[in-house]
Amino acid sequence: METLNLFIRSIFIDNMVFAFFFGMCSYIAVSKSVKTALGLGAAVTFVMVMTVPLNYLLNEYVLKANALVEGIDLSFLSFIVFIATIASFTQLVEMAVEKFSPTLYNQLGIFLQLIAVNCAIMGGSLFMQQKVDAGAIGNVWQSIVYGLGSGMGWWLAIVMMAAIREKTAYSHIPAALKGPGIAFIITGLMGIAFMIFSGIKL
């Protein structure tokens, strides 16, 4: 039940976009088409599913105090190690997308490479570390579930945003609000709507 609660919370309650506003650059820039949003969301989710558990293992057996050697604490290296892990998997995703879906690769452009510096992915690993210290994540399986839930939460957010923006293309929006302006307003409204999930406890 704790694992299910962790999964549900990471998608709806602790949503990377609506709760923490992480990954906003690619969220706003790539959410003009549902097809493109689906592709980027899948890529981000894959990277999070792979990097969060890997960073969990690195944190538990290398970085934490007394993990490698008694009296040695390498937790100050967390940022560098996590970024290196994320960058490595981003390269794998980029090569796979370029080989198997050149059209999607061209549509995503530089934003596929920018997954490496997507703060939602980095946030997933840092929040995992925080949850480990708080006792909410206690094993690799739970870290995988948390990575999957966080990735799916971001994926859900960008696909919803893309679907709405496709509709707004045919709406009468004031010139001053077209583009990022209306996107931020819609994001705020969706964030308020997602607050309804904050009372859920499993």
Where are these regions (language model features)?
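Ordered, amphipathic secondary-structure segments that act as subunit-interaction surfaces
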Residues: 60-108
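C-terminal ends of transmembrane helices
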Residues: 22-36, 90-104, 161-172
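Juxtamembrane transmembrane-helix termini in multi-pass membrane transport proteins
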Residues: 5-46
